[in-house]
Each structure stands twice: as C-alpha cells, then as structure tokens.
Design a protein with these regions (language model features):
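Short, intrinsically disordered, charge-balanced linker/junction segments flanking boundaries
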Residues: 140-147
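Glycine-rich FAD pyrophosphate-binding loop
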Residues: 24-44
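Short beta-strand/turn micro-motifs composed of small residues
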Residues: 11, 34, 98
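C-terminal lid/capping helical subdomain adjacent to the catalytic/cofactor pocket in oxidative enzymes
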Residues: 2-5, 26, 121
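Anionic group-transfer/hydrolysis microenvironments
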Residues: 8, 36, 54
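Dinucleotide-binding Rossmann-like beta1-alpha1 core, especially the glycine-rich loop
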Residues: 48-140
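Beta1/beta-strand and adjacent pyrophosphate-binding region of the FAD-binding site
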Residues: 1-15, 31
Length: 147
C-alpha cells in the first residue's frame, strides 16, 4: 500500500506538532518524523514546558507574545474540551532578575515596551512580600548546600 502525504515534517516536538496541527486543520495529510522515541525528550522538557515572551531577538519576542494569546485560549484553539485537564494552561507569571550578567534586562525591557508586552518591575521588598521563600540576596541557580 502506497502512503502519500501532503507534507512531511521533520520533528514532532512543540514546533513540529504545531505545524502538523495547523496543516491538518486545513485538510493536509501530514507525517511527522522525529529522532526521539516519544514526547518529552526535546527542548520543552528542559524548560519545564513554561511559555515566556522574553527572548534575545525582537522577532522571538513578537512571535512568543502572539503565541501567548493562543495559550490563554488553549481549548478554544484546539477546538477540543479536555475533560481530563491535560490540555490546561495555568498562567503563573515569570520572574527574571535584573543583574549585571544580563545587562539589567535592558534589551528585554526595551522589546517589551516596543511590543507593548505588559510586565511589572518588583523591588526586593515587593518580591519578599509576594514570595517569602525567595532569597533576594543571591541570584544564582539553585544548588545543594554541599556544592
């Protein structure tokens, strides 16, 4: 039996799956090919599957902010009511520290302003009041006390 596809997509992670989904909605027959055995092995697994709108390029920020609006209406976008709650978007925010190493987020703040992406600037006192567990005296990654 000969199998024919309108599009063969290399990768079936978040990008490949999204491309396939959009083409399928337009009636295309698609095939995704991926080097990994199943989901959860790609870049999304390293990011805890968070979405963010702060990237190093203008285009990256613009595309991410456009995508954010799809995530907010995730079930509507999927055209599917997920009774199990698996396809659930939980908006929890994201906190990034302004440090010398990231040039105090100058470029990210400029892009957010240019694209009218809302954000809040919290000082250490506000951080402590909202998130008492956070130690604002250090900005490094989490590590074991034995390190």
């Amino acid at each position: 039996m000969e199998k024919k596809f309108d599009a063969i997509i290399i990768g079936s992670g978040v990008i490949g799956a999204a491309i396939s989904f959009e083409l399928a909605k337009k009636g295309w027959k698609t095939l995704n090919i991926d080097k990994h055995p199943t989901s959860g092995f790609g870049s999304t697994s390293a990011s805890c599957a968070i979405i963010r709108v702060h990237y190093s390029t203008f285009d990256g920020c613009a595309l991410a902010y456009e995508g954010y609006h799809y995530w907010k209406k995730w079930e509507e976008y999927l055209e599917y009511k997920d009774e199990s709650g698996l396809a659930l978007f939980i908006e929890c925010g994201c906190m990034i520290y302004q440090t010398h190493e990231n040039d105090y987020l100058k470029n990210i703040i400029a892009r957010a302003n240019e694209l009218q992406i809302p954000f809040e600037k919290w000082d250490p006192k506000l951080i402590k009041s909202k998130l008492p567990i956070v130690d604002t005296r250090q900005f490094g990654p989490v590590k074991l006390t034995s390190d």
